[in-house]
Structure formats: C-alpha cells, structure tokens
Amino acid sequence: KKENLKNYNILAIPGGFSYGDDIVSGKILAVELTSFFSRELKKFIERKDTLIIGICNGFQVLIRTGLLPFRRIGKMDATLTNNDSGHFDCRWVNLKIEPNSKCVFLNNLTIGQFNNGLVSYQVAHGEGKFLAEKNTIDKIEKENLVTFRYIDDDGKSTQKYPENPNGSLNAIAGITDITGRILGLMPHPERFVKLEQHPNWRRVKYSKGTPALQ
C-alpha cells in the first residue's frame, strides 16, 4: 500500500470493465476495497472535505461496496444488473437532472442555467439496470438521492427501451448519498466535454453552460 486515502480529497472510480467484469460487473474491485480498505474508506467518507465519484463500472463498484446509496460499507442495498435488452448497449441517451438533488457535483447545474435541466450523455454497459427492494427505492426517492433519470423525447422519465437503455427502476441513471458528496451514474459525462463531441452539435442549441460543461 504505497499511498493512503488520508492524503487525498477525491476518490474517482472510472468506467472500464475492472477485472474484465468477471463474476459480475465491479464485483472483484468492490470486494478488494471492502476487504482491504474498509477502515480507510470509512474514515474517508467521515471527513467533510472529501468527494467520491463512480462512473459506469465505478458506479457498479460503489453499489457493491455499499457506499451507495446509504454509506453502509460491506452491505449491498441495491444492485446494477443485466440490461433488459439482454445485450451491451452503447448509445446516446437523454437525462433529466433532478432539481431537488443534494449532490454537490450538481451544485452549479441548476434548471434555469443548464438547458432546462436536460442533458445528453453516452451509455456503454451491459449491466446497468438499477434494481432494489421497494422499501429501498422508496427511501431513495424520499431522501432525494436520485441525481439523473432517463427521459423520453417529451422530457418525461421513462421505462421504455431504448430511451431507458437498461430498464432501471424509476428510470434511475444516477444517485447520490445523504451528504451529496458521493455520486454514481451509469452514463459517461467524461465522453462529452466539448460540444463538438455530440453527434448533433451543429443542430442542437444549448443554453449557456451547455451539457458539455464548457
């Protein structure tokens, strides 16, 4: 262990099929983190000056470690399982930023300033369906932990494919924790950092700020 989490303020777990998605997506890395770094993780999230983000495979890891949704390290309260389509999906999807989200990563992305709270990002996964018991889903909704939802062309959350690429319950594409300092999402915002990276960038007009975070 050459480094210690106490020396850092941000833990970022990117996408990328850790350990080849053996067993299930994110499982092995999650087991390693909870087996060898549970104490460090607990101390890390207890600090007030830390942030954690997990994208795609990173979101799967955060779910399987128990960091999301309820910060219960070693306890899984939800899962990200096989897409309803039965195959890997790589496509652009439309998302709505939840206006009541407490996630600090979204602090400057208010509805009025960010294309009316609608964004487009790529998804690229085979196991992205957010699934949990009803009482867990109800708690997530009650505590405003949802950050992003898949939406249709009318801007409404949807369960229909392909707008919802995996069949996630309540069209959930991303969630945060009760502090708002941990964010996990299946879509890839890092693939859209310049407006020109969107396939319709010449046709679509965006408000100041743009989904590309320029």
Where do the PLM segments sit?
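Amide-donor transfer/coupling interface in amidating biosynthetic enzymes
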Residues: K2-E3, L41-I45, K75-Q214
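Short beta-strand segments
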Residues: A12-P14, G54-C56, Q122-A124, M186
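Cysteine-nucleophile active-site neighborhood
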Residues: Y19-K102
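N-terminal cofactor/phosphate-binding cores enriched in small/glycine residues
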Residues: K1, L5-D21
